[in-house]
Amino acid sequence: MLVKADMTKDIAQVMAEVGRKAKAAAAPLSIATSEQKNKALNAAADAILEARADILEANRLDLANAEKNGMAASFVDRLTLNEARIDAIAEGIRAIATLPDPVGEVIAEWDRPNGLHIERVRTPLGVIGVIYESRPNVTADAGALCLKAGNAVILRGGSDSAHSSAAIYKALVKGLEAANLPADAIQIVPVTDRAAVGEMLKGLGGAIDVIVPRGGKSLVARVQSEARVPVFAHLEGICHLYIDKSADLDMARRIALDAKMRRTGICGAAETLLVDRAVASTHLAPILGDLAAGGCEIRGSAEVLALYPAAKPATEEDWSTEYLDAIISVALVDGISGAIDHINRYSSHHTEAIVAEDAQTVARFFNEIDSAILLHNASTQFADGGEFGMGAEIGIATGKMHARGPVGVEQLTSFKYRVRGSGQVRG
């Protein structure tokens, strides 16, 4: 149960105990069999479906608070659970259960001239701290992915989704118990006080091995600034879609509409549309017309306004804004070179897409843009661990160390070397 504060212990004591329990659970979990972990995951999926009514009721409490606090529509969308989304959460957990177990996988092996046989083998990271905001589904995704990779996890969701996350967490614990795995392998921070985040960022006395923040720019900035343990950083998704002069117009229209409007509140939603100046007179109006008809606000450069007067003027700030809403900024560029320059200047290095038929243009896009995910002739909304066949993701890392792109079960492991000899000494 979540409480505002514990009157008998201060926050540091509460969190130290959480860390101690996680560390103790990590050891047996690291050697759990694939069968045990999969049994726990499938049992957790069953428990989520069985608790559907309780989860929806908990979510209604969170939604009522969000409405009371005047939260934005995009925030409410991320917070909302319904029958279909609960089904998807359970299906996502089952999909994770079907994935190959990464723990113990031999990544590489070789023999040395002296007869030593060396293997590089995947191992769990240990204890992972996940700090997130309004997405209650992250409770399930993060818990399930960490379990599959043999890691204990400490979950700290935002107070806005506290009731929903707590209801989902109960189902995850039932899964652990069904497989005779330590119940403390998945823990939810039992207090809503923000000081708990600060304690996690300090590492809980060496208990936490890595922090994964999943939320807005201010959350990620705080984590990166204060963390004393490694961080898988997930910055905002300032995602670009570039329509090249070689693009098929019908394809471009379908992709642009989906990339922006399928779900506007996710990090893979396109925030900026770039159109090759060479085809602006034929391609711009149909694409923007589709977006406007779908309820999207268009913010354009002066050139865009001249061709599409219904647009609003874009400011310099628009090019570096993650809207997470039905708003898109639009500019014309001088072909692929102009697109590359614009993207590399304003991108958060999350996801970019190109619609083009010219192979050399696509090759330049792939080679010269430094973002975690690059797509050709596909919507930016495929920037998702589930769509990558990972079952789910704990986030999309935009940094370059250890994990980049969707963080799935493989990215939640480290490795060690096993060296087998027959009496060799260096002498």
UniProtKB/Swiss-Prot annotation:
GO terms for biological process: L-proline biosynthetic process. HAMAP family: ProA (MF_00412). Its EC number is 1.2.1.41. Pathway: Amino-acid biosynthesis; L-proline biosynthesis; L-glutamate 5-semialdehyde from L-glutamate: step 2/2. GO terms for cellular component: cytoplasm. It is an enzyme of class 1 (oxidoreductase). It catalyses: L-glutamate 5-semialdehyde + phosphate + NADP(+) = L-glutamyl 5-phosphate + NADPH + H(+). Catalyzes the NADPH-dependent reduction of L-glutamate 5-phosphate into L-glutamate 5-semialdehyde and phosphate. The product spontaneously undergoes cyclization to form 1-pyrroline-5-carboxylate. It is found in: Cytoplasm. This is Gamma-glutamyl phosphate reductase. Keywords: Amino-acid biosynthesis, Cytoplasm, NADP, Oxidoreductase, Proline biosynthesis.
